[in-house]
Amino acid sequence: MNPMRKNIAEMAGYVPGFQPRDEQNYTKLNTNENPYPPSPKVIEAILAEVGDNLRKYPDAASRAGCEEAGRLYGFDPDWVIMANGSDEVLNNLIRAFAGEGEEIAYVHPSYSYYSTLAEIQGAKVRTFLLDEGWALKDFPERYTGKLFFLTNPNAPLGFCYPQEFIEELAGRVDGMLVVDEAYADFAKENSLDLVRRLPNVVVTRTFSKSYSLAGMRLGLAIAHPEVIAALNKIRDHYNLDRLAQTACVAALADQEYFQQCVSKIRETRDWFSAELRVLDWDVIPSHGNFVFATPPDRNGKRVYDALFERRILVRYFSDPVLSHGLRISVGTREEMEKTLAALADIG
């Protein structure tokens, strides 16, 4: 007899982007990492924390991070929870709100990890497809499931929903509307104001993209204090180590460096998109740190393989909804020039 839970034994699990062990030998544009290093103040703060303090447990509530995020975004600290990557918050939201057999939903295509997290919990999953104008197909007047996840800006496509649409959607969701803003720092709008006004809206953020801290696993959520209190009950009690908490505070405090990096990425993204169009690629206007684009022959796999041979990594999705194109992370100007030259050669 196999004592393993049936749903765990049968699930496939999430497959992340390829991470080469010899990454220095690749142009790595497949996992939406920031091409620039963390703030020098972050490195300085981490190095200052390394030493005798590491023998002590970290602050279980990550209070300094909650306070710094609250100051930056205009919330009291009890509206904020820090996490070991925003994935931890997404996982705990499902654990807190969706029991076995209960339903969560999300837009397809978007972040498929929502489905994996629901499978672990034994929850049901429902997806809503997009029409050509990015509207949700067949969305009911009232959605009665426990959680609805909306990735905004959308990943992997990069478009952004207007806040008016998100507010209307929140009014049609009986449960919680989770706005996954992993890429919001590269966009012009966010949903933080909706959190203040609507108790069923949660915003999640990550430090992996705009703050260059993918290797530290840092994220946060902002929500009504009752929701935050529930998430605090079920998170790992020491979910952020001392170095991560130190990096979090230093990163949030150095907004000048943050804005410089974000501005450079936006500028490179828009330039790269324009250059792809010169090559007759179909490019979706992006509000993230990546571009989803389709080659003239609509054969994303062919171009992916040709780039891989040149040790340029981009993201290909075999899903029929996405297989015509590629998601290309925005790197440095030099990396994107190299990629454009390769694409012109590949044809």
Curated annotation (Swiss-Prot):
Report the residues modified as N6-(pyridoxal phosphate)lysine: K209
Q: Which of UniProt's keywords are assigned here?
A: Amino-acid biosynthesis, Aminotransferase, Histidine biosynthesis, Pyridoxal phosphate, Transferase
Gene Ontology molecular function, alphabetical:
histidinol-phosphate transaminase activity; pyridoxal phosphate binding
Question: What family does this chain come from, according to its entry?
Answer: Belongs to the class-II pyridoxal-phosphate-dependent aminotransferase family. Histidinol-phosphate aminotransferase subfamily.
Pfam families in the cross-refs: Aminotran_1_2
What InterPro entries does the database record attribute to this sequence? Aminotrans_II_pyridoxalP_BS, Aminotransferase_I/II_large, HisP_aminotrans, HistidinolP_aminotransfase, PyrdxlP-dep_Trfase, PyrdxlP-dep_Trfase_major, PyrdxlP-dep_Trfase_small
Report the PROSITE patterns cross-referenced here: AA_TRANSFER_CLASS_2
Listed under catalytic activity are: L-histidinol phosphate + 2-oxoglutarate = 3-(imidazol-4-yl)-2-oxopropyl phosphate + L-glutamate
Top EC class, one word: transferase
Pathway annotation: Amino-acid biosynthesis; L-histidine biosynthesis; L-histidine from 5-phospho-alpha-D-ribose 1-diphosphate: step 7/9
- Record-listed E.C. numbers: 2.6.1.9
- CDD domains, from UniProt? AAT_like (cd00609)
**Could you tell me what this protein is called?**
Histidinol-phosphate aminotransferase
The Gene Ontology biological process annotation of the record reads:
L-histidine biosynthetic process
User: What interactions and quaternary structure are annotated?
Assistant: Homodimer.
Its needed co-factors are: pyridoxal 5'-phosphate
User: Any stretches that span the bilayer, and where are they?
Assistant: none
